[in-house]
Curated annotation (Swiss-Prot):
This is Putative hydro-lyase M446_2125. Its EC number is 4.2.1.-. Gene3D superfamilies: PSTPO5379-like, PSTPO5379-like domain. HAMAP family: Hydro_lyase. Pfam families: D-Glu_cyclase. Keywords: Lyase. GO terms for molecular function: lyase activity. The keyword Nucleotide-binding does not apply. NCBIfam families: PRK05463.1 (NF003969). Belongs to the D-glutamate cyclase family. It comes from the Bacteria.
Length: 269
């Protein structure tokens, strides 16, 4: 369907319309710019016997893992996030993990669903990006039409049960003046990662080469810009790789669950 390739038309979709399009396979890959104003979420799905430990892990690491919804065991719905929402079909890209290894990427995980699986929806930076755009701040990955670059750092998350590993951050290049404004704007959204965790000096958090992100795509950094880093909801994928649960499902980086909630609901000021 042609309208789904047009950025302006993609932005005009409601959250429900976006989910239905993903369910039909009409939207694949990055959901950046999709359903303007609607909250998007990272996804982590784990067996019930690991759910309590993962919830504790998220509570101990609220910057990279801000939980905005949890399903009941075996339930493919998270009612507080949307009507007619199906965790197993409504994401534009999934990753399947076994014993810490990503073994498959697919567009539907309905045939893998089990009665013991619990889904966690985790706040996504696309919510604060909308506020940045409204304030006139540039988003280089959007300008370039690529996924935001994401990096594994040497900053450890606080462990819980079997879950431990490094924080993942997303990066957006900004001038120093823009970075100050970005801190002010994103601080209003603590439920979707909030303010940056690091500015400049990528090597200080273990990032050796900005041109080689661990997830997403590289972007240009101009001579008058600094890299600004936010905690990222891809962190659970790094933790799953380190913790090696027997089975897990996540979203593919950049491919989010679009909800019926509005970004404005998550602003604190």
């Amino acid at each position: 369907m042609t309208f789904l390739r047009n950025p302006a038309d993609r932005a005009r979709l409601t959250g429900h319309e976006a989910r239905l399009a993903c369910r039909r396979g009409e939207i694949v890959g990055s959901t950046a710019g999709l359903a303007h104003g609607y909250v998007q979420a990272n996804l982590a799905v784990l067996p019930k016997d690991l759910a309590t430990d993962f919830l504790l892990f998220a509570q101990r690491n609220p910057k990279p893992c801000p939980i905005i919804g949890v399903s009941a065991p075996g339930d493919r719905r998270i009612p507080e996030l949307g009507e007619d929402l199906d965790i197993a079909t409504d994401v534009s890209g999934y990753r399947v993990w076994r014993h810490g290894e990503m073994v498959e990427e697919r567009l539907d995980v309905a045939d893998l669903w089990r009665d013991d699986l619990v889904a966690f929806a985790i706040g996504c930076s696309f919510s604060f990006e909308a506020a940045m755009v409204e304030d006139g701040l540039p988003l280089r990955h959007v300008e370039m039409g690529v996924r935001v670059p994401m990096y594994r750092t040497t900053v450890p998350c606080r462990p819980a049960g079997p879950f431990a590993g490094p924080m993942v951050v997303s990066m957006r290049p900004l001038t120093p003046a823009q970075a100050i404004r970005a801190v002010q704007i994103t601080s209003r959204f603590p439920a979707v990662h909030g303010a940056p965790v690091h500015l400049g000096l990528p090597e200080a958090i273990g990032i050796r080469d900005l041109g080689r992100p661990d997830y997403g795509d590289p972007v240009r950094v101009a001579p008058d810009e600094i890299p600004v880093f936010w905690a990222c909801g891809v962190t659970p994928q790094s933790v799953i790789a380190a913790s090696k649960p027997s089975f897990a499902i996540t979203h593919a980086p950049g491919a989010m669950l679009v909800t019926d909630r509005r970004n404005s609901e998550f602003a604190v000021l």
